[in-house]
Design a protein with these regions (language model features):
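Selective transmembrane helix interface/packing segments
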Residues: 1-227
Length: 227
């Protein structure tokens, strides 16, 4: 257990990287790398797009984008369609951040600051979507539903949401690490590699889906109050 404790402390430690005399957290540097990678891939995939006689690459890209857009639009409705690009962008970032562990790089999502930032961005957009759909008065009125006595609970619910999103993502990613370390202690050869691949690939993608799905559900609830 001492080995597990030491490994956990090392994993939770925020490493700093010196860039031009500035100490920058490793998770931030890795996030920059992920964003640069996504920008380059986006440029490569979207260049030379055509209206007629499209290439197989463009056909596959359109199918993927249309499928994801239809999924979120079906969940949020037409009013929530404007927020689909954000959800897709966050999904791509979290997926890459979780999968980067396959290459021996510490995932940024193991840094509580990163998951907290993602949760805060999402919750700001969730509340904005509610204000945009209902108007300022309608949003304030929703805080008193179903009766004014519930106002403190409704405000508390808004405050709890980012904590829920943040800790769920951080906790699941960290939990996968703890499971891997326990497996290494029991079966140190061969088996850990298989479980590591599973946790890095499938569990990382599952956590991506859970985060954006919960964000979209909260957003739907916030928008749907006007109906």
């Amino acid at each position: 257990m001492n080995a597990l404790t030491a490994a956990l402390k090392e994993e939770l430690n925020v490493e700093m990287i010196s860039l031009g005399g500035l100490q920058v957290p490793e998770s931030v540097v890795v996030s920059w790398g992920i964003m640069l990678f996504l920008v380059i891939v986006s440029i490569l995939l979207t260049r030379n797009l055509k209206v007629d006689h499209i290439s197989r690459r463009q056909a596959i890209l359109e199918l993927v984008v249309t499928t994801i857009d239809s999924f979120f639009t079906g969940l949020l409705g037409e009013q929530g369609r404007r927020y689909v690009p954000y959800l897709m962008t966050v999904a791509l970032y979290i997926a890459c951040a979780n999968l980067i562990g396959v290459f021996g790089i510490k995932p940024p999502t193991k840094d509580l600051n990163v998951t907290a930032a993602l949760a805060l961005m999402s919750i700001c957009l969730i509340e904005y979507s509610g204000i945009h759909a209902r108007g300022g008065k309608g949003f304030l009125k929703s805080l008193t539903a179903p009766t004014p006595i519930m106002t403190p609970m409704n405000i508390l619910e808004i405050a709890i949401r980012p904590t829920s999103l943040c800790m769920r993502l951080f906790g699941n990613v960290l939990g996968a690490f703890v499971i891997m370390e326990l497996i290494k202690l029991v079966v140190p050869v061969f088996v850990p590699a298989i479980f590591s691949l599973y946790l890095d690939l499938f569990d990382g993608l599952i956590q991506t889906y859970v985060f954006v799905f919960l964000t979209s559900l909260f957003m739907k609830e916030s928008i749907g109050g006007e109906e």
